[in-house]
Amino acid sequence: MKRKDIKRQIRKQLKYKHPHWKNMRKSAKKKLLREIADEVMNNYDCSQLMNVPLEELIGIESQVPTAGIRTLKEMAKYIENFHNDNLFILDSNRQFKDKLFDPELKFIDSLFDNAIINTLLAPTGYSPAHREVHPYQLFRMELLKAIKYPEISYRKFCTDEYFGQERQQNRAFVGLPPDTDDQIDHTELCHFRLGLSFRQIMNMMVYALHHFYQSGCLENAIIHGVDSSELPMETNYPLCTIKVNGKNVRIYTDPDCDCGKRRSKRDKSSYVIGYRMHTLTAINPSTGHSFPLLSIVGAANHHDSLFLTPLIKLAQSMGIEMKLITADQAYHDGDGEILKETGVHVIAPPSEKVNLPENVQEFPLRVTCNEHCNIPMKFIGKSSTGHEFACNAESCECMFETDCIKFRTIPSDSGYFQPMPTFLNQSEQAIKIRKHIERPFNLMKKREGLEQTRVRSQHGVIVRSAVTTIATLVLEMAGTRRKQSRKQDKQMDLFAAAG
């Protein structure tokens, strides 16, 4: 944690005391970073106790619940009353609707209300009468790129090739006049992303989630899951490296990113420089389909378990109700702190690093009272001290019946005895369904193009991940890219009839 605190202080000085340092030459950046790092190291007292919030240590202090983020219920009421307060409903994009032929774009155009998007994303002092380009147009451009053109750069996207007179459908979807050559420059999109606050991003997410919950893609009984995926940045070497307790602290061109480890992959390095996206998903138990709901973006070097509590709190502030989360071993809640703080059970596969308690057999799992007893005990519940087991022997079955206490408590751990024990049927089913969590990551990174972030800051990655999540949700709602069930082979029917 000391290394995280030192990196936090360096990052804070760069952002607030030198806001224009990104425009400096590389040699000047290195010199400035070395001066700041030396100053922080000389003034840092390792013996002093840290009183820094976890969110600041892991670099997500800008992604915490803030005032102004609406819940799902508040958003539903806001949408219901929005047009009731207006005498006339004017749709400036109505004249372009006959240009839309793509079923996906037609569905999205009918789903999102431009006036509501303007109120959610408009900057302070926004005046529609004095604007040629409105927030809803810029948001639609981001959405169009994620859905139709994820593989190209922003600079190429904002050209005649995609918004010229021959591209009437794209112009109609964004809201550009069909009879002019007016276009939106890529720098306007860049300024739009930089100008969005976290409150605006989350309110737009809540707006999309409101429509998603109304679409019927999920049932009443759902299980939530959490997993992470790396988002590499276009940087290879640190500008400055310092030693803290024998370990390196690296500062890159983007001070918020860092070097972390990832799972072994055949065609990729085991290390990645960039960010890691921690995503909350909703799983439909009857179909096994999972959908992304919300993400937090942090540096790749931090352990996954540090992001689980902030992610749950952010989801709860948006009105997402959770009871059970299934995740991998990196998100263990062995001490039960997450359950106490958020009221959400976290279930993960048992960790191989945790030793079994005394007098516990692993395969099949059974608990006995002591080393002399061979009769399995029954699980009766959980208390503040741990998991409680009682004797399950019949009368006169146990030879130690008169001297045995017939009761045992096993503390919680990250193995089989988690706050929600893994030997329960519900836990086993939740662990089995965890494999479906990987599907949204494959869609967001491969289909919607998030694997190449094409932005150069943490804030840009946050906006890109939010837009990509919304794009994934609307495509699932549209249902245009679902695989059709394979038709049965007629030759097999012939063989069955021949019998």
Mark where each language-model region is.
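Basic, amphipathic alpha-helical segments enriched in Lys/Arg and hydrophobic/aromatic residues
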Residues: 427-499
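Short, positively charged, Gly/Tyr-enriched micro-motifs
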Residues: 130-205, 219, 459
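An internal, acidic/charged active-site-proximal segment
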Residues: 298, 302-395, 421
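Dynamic "connector" segments at or just before major functional cores
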Residues: 4, 58, 64-138, 142-150, ...
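Amphipathic alpha-helical segments in structured regions that serve as interaction surfaces
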Residues: 3-21, 28-46, 53-56, 60-61
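Short alpha-helical "recognition helix" segments of helix-turn-helix
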Residues: 46-47, 157
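Polybasic low-complexity intrinsically disordered regions
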Residues: 159, 190-339
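Short amphipathic alpha-helical "interface-anchor" segments enriched in bulky aromatics
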Residues: 161-162, 329, 360-382, 411-458
